[in-house]
């Protein structure tokens, strides 16, 4: 890595729902596209159309009407490596237009993922893409870098997995990390179910994307759920309409806050788990009593599923009810939190002190994929 100065590392945050990719040192990702691989449902009859057997990302999204869409990552864990390779290939060659064999690559991963997952990631980077060096970083830790803190508890909630990671003076506290397999995709599925009950049919993988868009545009989190329900029954202030691609208009009211309420009450979808506010509290309680005060004062939200309006207030109120009454609770919701994992990766990969942390190809050739557990936290 002697000539590392003139080579920009690549940062690729492979989310369950979206891939965020770009160059270290930039302040935002260059490429953001859905982690989707689509395959045609029908046989092609017109010759010379240049039809492909698989489409990736935005192209798959735009042709979704004729494709079966598959997400290769589920709950933050790669379930289909062939499709994942397609996504990485698309990221490097089509989106960023770089040769991966010329750049170190920083990848991200959810905490408490199976060890085999990061080993396979390492193997593909070195053997398929021939990268000179790579590193796998924990997503929530990167979000804390992006917020400019060294102490705090990060609630990172994306499309596939949510987790709380307490960090004190730069040290992650692994015994207190909690993972909740409840995130954006579960909310989308729940909204699909609610809409089906109301007589709208959303069943295919392509229609799920419409519901996801509806969720992102219209859903919000009520500060007091029961009271908001009463308001919705009597007044029309909550009503919003959404136009489907075919021009049909749907009106949704109470469903706007019923859908993301699942984050705080997972029992809505039959999950026997604590809500995100309680998970954060449980995570803090697993930490040493001396550092809890600092964690309560620095609850940092990150990831796309924390973008709902009203989430910070509700989070503060939820923890206020659980924590000691005199405790000062501060919830930080940075406006760029949708991309804060990527931004943190960009910061980390461009630090001069980080340059000796990369796993070099030579080290990989010597030790094999298991090197990733020794070099990456």
From Swiss-Prot:
Function: Actins are highly conserved proteins that are involved in various types of cell motility and are ubiquitously expressed in all eukaryotic cells. Essential component of cell cytoskeleton; plays an important role in cytoplasmic streaming, cell shape determination, cell division, organelle movement and extension growth.
Pfam families hit by this protein: Actin
A GO CC term assigned to this protein in UniProt: cytoplasm
UniProt KW keywords: ATP-binding, Cytoplasm, Cytoskeleton, Hydrolase, Nucleotide-binding
InterPro entries according to UniProt: Actin, Actin/actin-like_CS, Actin_CS, ATPase_NBD
Main location class: cytoplasm
GO molecular function: ATP binding; hydrolase activity
Matching PANTHER family: ACTIN
EC supergroup of this enzyme: hydrolase
UniProt-listed Gene3D superfamilies: 3.30.420.40, Actin, Chain A, domain 4 (3.90.640.10)
Lineage, uppermost ranks: Eukaryota, Viridiplantae, Streptophyta, Embryophyta, Tracheophyta
Protein name in UniProt: Actin-1
Family membership: Belongs to the actin family.
EC number of this enzyme: 3.6.4.-
Compartments reported by the entry: Cytoplasm, Cytoskeleton
Domain of life according to the entry: Eukaryota
Reaction equation(s) it catalyzes: ATP + H2O = ADP + phosphate + H(+)
